[in-house]
């Protein structure tokens, strides 16, 4: 069974950041520690944990840019469970939290290989974004809750 919640223990936080590093940073030769951003304590975090194995299989965070705009960052899903709904669980959790806070819009910078996923859950591309590590194209995407519901 998959459970979505915020990390609570030191061990969960360690696993949370390890998954983020393994999926988003290590494949491009980035240093360990680069997966932890300066404003982590000011963001909301979500993880998906497999209750049978106690393995964290997905992580994501959302920062509040303005009282009505949130920004999702650092979404990482373990390769062996990609395509099985983990990303959707993470996004639903953060979107529900955003709506509880009165946030009307979520923006994100999607890696090119994730654009199709975000389109499938109601996000739209509104402009191209940056090129990470000189090779990973990102696209600015958003979901307007007023328009989506």
Task: Please provide the spans of the model-predicted regions.
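Anionic, Ser/Thr-rich low-complexity intrinsically disordered regions
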Residues: 1-121, 126-145, 149
């Amino acid at each position: 069974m998959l459970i979505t919640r915020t990390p609570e223990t030191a061990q969960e936080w360690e696993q949370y950041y390890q998954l983020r590093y393994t999926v988003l940073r290590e494949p491009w030769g980035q240093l360990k520690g680069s997966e932890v951003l300066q404003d982590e304590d000011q963001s909301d975090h979500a993880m998906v944990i497999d209750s049978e194995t106690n393995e964290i299989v997905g992580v994501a965070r959302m920062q509040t840019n303005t009282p009505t705009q949130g920004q999702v960052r650092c979404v990482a899903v373990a390769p062996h469970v990609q395509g099985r709904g983990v990303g959707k669980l993470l996004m639903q959790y953060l979107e529900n939290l955003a709506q509880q806070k009165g946030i009307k819009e979520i923006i994100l910078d999607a890696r090119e290989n994730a654009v199709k996923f975000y389109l499938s859950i109601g996000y739209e591309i509104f402009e191209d974004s940056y090129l990470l590590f000189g090779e990973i194209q990102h696209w600015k995407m958003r979901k307007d809750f007023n328009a989506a519901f």
